[in-house]
Swiss-Prot record:
Functional summary from the UniProt entry: Dehydrogenase, part of the gene cluster that mediates the biosynthesis of melleolides, a range of antifungal and phytotoxic polyketide derivatives composed of an orsellinic acid (OA) moiety esterified to various sesquiterpene alcohols. The first step in melleolides biosynthesis is performed by the delta(6)-protoilludene synthase PRO1 which catalyzes the cyclization of farnesyl diphosphate to protoilludene. The orsellinic acid synthase armB produces OA by condensing acetyl-CoA with 3 malonyl-CoA units in a three-round chain elongation reaction folowed by a C2-C7 ring closure.
Organism expressing this protein natively: Armillaria gallica (Bulbous honey fungus)
Gene3D superfamilies, sorted: FAD/NAD(P)-binding domain (3.50.50.60), Glucose Oxidase, domain 3 (3.30.560.10)
Pathway it works in: Secondary metabolite biosynthesis
Pfam families linked: GMC_oxred_C, GMC_oxred_N
Protein family (similarity comment): Belongs to the GMC oxidoreductase family.
Signal peptide: 1-19
GO molecular function, one term: flavin adenine dinucleotide binding
Residues annotated as binding FAD: 49-50, 70-71, 104, 134-137, 280, 603, 614-615
Active site: 570 (proton acceptor)
UniProt name for this protein: Dehydrogenase ARMGADRAFT_1018426
EC number, UniProt record: 1.1.1.-
UniProt entry tagged with the keyword Iron-sulfur: no
Length: 636
């Protein structure tokens, strides 16, 4: 555990544990055996971001007996999850990532675009899934991103921004911002597009570090904002109020699927049954109707059990696990299944393909003396004591702080017009040399429209107000780490099984930088970052890479990118919601093509990345899926 994270927990951990109310089930404890004998209508595989939304909403109907199987355990009220700077660990390295109690600890296959590097793939191994360990960022993509779901991918008008907005608002309990980078606190536009009665709290920082206003104003001076309403369909440029997060301002704690959708009400429902610590190994099919699911098999340690589902099985195991479960059950690419001697139930060649993952590439900078960053929590005892007191008494201050400067930006705004024309011509040449799937043709045409239009965010800038992301910070110094990433990466990977062992992890190939656009675009963004932060007048000097990088060639920048690139932990797309002629896996009502009663409800159904962190969109689609399932089962 990093020293600073340990310091944070030592400062606030005990008080946090004892101050939080515990939640108790009103029902008898659920055991693997008792769950197996329960009569269920719907079995939800995965108690994560989407799965718990479904569990809560479906069990509102007394017509349904709902079961949830989650591989992790219930860790609500755990300070490593609840306190932002403990779980988030000041820049993506910390107490929950790489900790097998909280993280499945997936890894990629060696990445051919990164010289064979193997990357970690954190994924939440607790009730609430990755909503329990993510960076708490709440963002919506652009109107164009969601309109494409409905129009370009053949899902119809119910999958456009205006049609989806009510489902975004349904999950939200929005709190107006209290700070602004420009002094303008008019949030009427935001208020109009957010809900206030939902389950997940959304709020803004109540504390700014010494870098937030200068860096935002430097971006504005370069023509990149401000935007007053990034959630109304135009998500690009520097937001005036900073990034919004799933943080409850009343408690100073993370708001996530487990404490938002599995509270005391759900725990006391007699028609909602939750089993934790169990891994689903396969779907069980009707012997007479091979495409009809009648239940699932699950493992607890070395023991296996089955449970029946009289109506539906819903996979909410995430972009990396939902395809694995289907393949183990005989659904997927026929060639792969036959090579493993798995009887084929339905041949779906594109299941597990279309993996899209945003990556992060960091650069860090030493700030000038007197500029406060989160490094001061470890460097300045007076500042630490002040922030401890603020958190203990008001649940405010640095312990609730999350990255504030988060600017999805059109890359055309960050490079010269000549640079852009050269990049675009190279992209066209590369794509013309490739054999593309029908889905990829639609995706790449959309991204080219986004790029040329110069409005939709196609790159992303994120400031971590501390050092340590790229290199080890010097003692007593303050730093910032700036993350550059493609909002709509063009490299396409996949996730598949290579064994019939259901407890083995799938092979995850993100295929980072296999499309040259991703590398060229990112190094140009990193070059822009150096110009941008220098304009803010808070930087003493570049850290990593050093000042000499200003004279680097593109090849040197690409070598640096290959050495520092990491996953953003935003995998989507491996069971795309799209028409069958495009190679889609699920239909607009989340049903798997060719199967009678199996749905997928998680980020794997995104047909294309929406350019921002996927958690908000995942909550939204789960709310929408709950309505679809209730209607189809006549369970209102």
């Amino acid at each position: 555990m990093p020293a600073l994270t340990y310091l944070l927990l030592a400062a606030i951990g005990a008080s946090t544990v004892h101050s939080l109310p515990s939640q108790q089930s009103c029902n008898a404890p659920v055991t693997p055996s008792s769950f197996s004998s329960t009569s269920l209508d719907v079995v939800i595989v995965g108690g994560g971001t989407a799965g718990l939304v479904l569990a809560s909403r479906l069990s509102e109907s007394k017509k349904l007996q709902v079961g949830v199987i989650e591989g992790g355990y219930d860790r609500t009220n755990d300070p490593l999850i609840d306190v932002p700077n403990a779980a988030n660990a000041l820049g993506y390295q910390g107490a929950v990532f790489g900790n097998s109690t909280y993280d499945w600890e997936y890894t990629s296959v060696p990445q051919r675009g990164l010289g064979g590097r193997v990357l970690s793939y954190p994924s939440g191994k607790v009730l609430g899934g990755s909503s329990a360990i993510n960076g708490l960022t709440i963002q919506r993509g652009s109107r164009e991103d969601y309109d494409a779901w409905g129009n370009a991918f053949g899902n119809g008008p119910e999958w456009t921004f205006d049609a989806l907005l009510p489902y975004f608002k349904r999950y939200e309990r929005w709190h107006a911002p209290t700070l602004s980078a420009t002094g303008d606190l008019n949030s009427d536009g935001l208020s109009a597009v957010h809900g206030t009665d939902g389950r997940i709290s959304i709020s803004y920082n109540n504390f700014f570090t010494g870098v937030d206003i200068p860096l935002t104003q430097a971006g504005i001076a370069l023509g990149l904002g401000p935007t007053q309403n990034p959630d109304g369909g135009d998500d690009s440029l520097f937001p005036n109020f900073g990034a919004s997060h799933s943080l409850d301002p009343a408690t100073g704690n993370r708001s996530y699927a487990a404490n938002g959708y599995y509270g005391q009400t759900e725990r006391c429902r007699s028609n909602l049954h939750l089993l934790t610590g169990a891994v689903v190994t396969r779907i069980i099919w009707d012997k007479k109707k091979a495409t009809k699911a009648v239940g699932v098999e699950y493992a607890v340690g070395n023991d296996k059990f089955t449970v029946k589902a009289s109506k539906e099985v819903v996979l909410s195991a995430g972009s990396l696990r939902s395809p694995q479960i289907l393949e183990l059950s005989g659904v997927g690419n026929k060639t792969l299944l036959e090579s493993l001697n798995i009887p084929v139930v339905v041949d779906i060649p594109q299941l597990g393909e279309n993996l899209q993952e945003q990556f992060i590439a960091g650069t860090d900078f030493l700030v000038r003396d007197g500029v406060v960053t989160l490094d001061a929590l470890g460097n300045n005892a007076t500042f630490l004591a002040e922030q401890q007191n603020l958190y203990r008494t008001n649940k405010t201050g640095a312990f609730t702080y999350l990255s504030n400067v988060n600017a999805p930006t059109p890359i055309r705004s960050l490079v010269t017009e000549d640079q852009y024309k050269t990049m675009r011509a190279a992209l066209d040449t590369y794509l013309a040399s490739q054999t593309l799937t029908p889905l990829q043709i639609v995706q790449y045409n959309l991204v080219k429209q986004f790029l040329d239009g110069g409005k939709v965010a196609t790159s992303s800038l994120l400031v971590v107000a501390s050092g340590g992301l790229v290199s080890t910070p010097a003692a007593g110094q303050g730093y910032i780490s700036v993350v550059s990433s493609p909002a709509h990466p063009l490299s396409r990977g996949n996730v598949h099984i290579n064994t019939t062992d259901p407890l083995a992890y799938p092979l995850i190939d993100s295929a980072f930088l296999t499309n040259p656009w991703d590398a060229q675009a990112t190094i140009n963004v990193m070059k822009f970052v150096r110009r941008w932060v220098a304009k803010s007048d808070i930087i003493e000097s570049p850290g990593t890479p050093p000042q000499a990088a200003d004279e680097w060639s593109d090849d040197q920048w690409i070598a640096y990118l290959q050495s520092v690139l990491g996953t953003a932990h935003h995998p989507v797309g491996t069971a795309a919601m799209a028409s069958q002629k495009l190679g889609g896996v699920v239909d607009p009502r989340f049903k798997v093509y060719g199967l009678k009663n199996v749905r997928i409800v998680d980020a794997s159904v995104f047909p294309m990345h929406i350019g921002v962190a996927p958690s908000s969109t995942t909550y939204m689609l789960a709310e929408k899926a709950a309505d679809a399932i209730k209607k189809d089962l006549n369970a209102y």
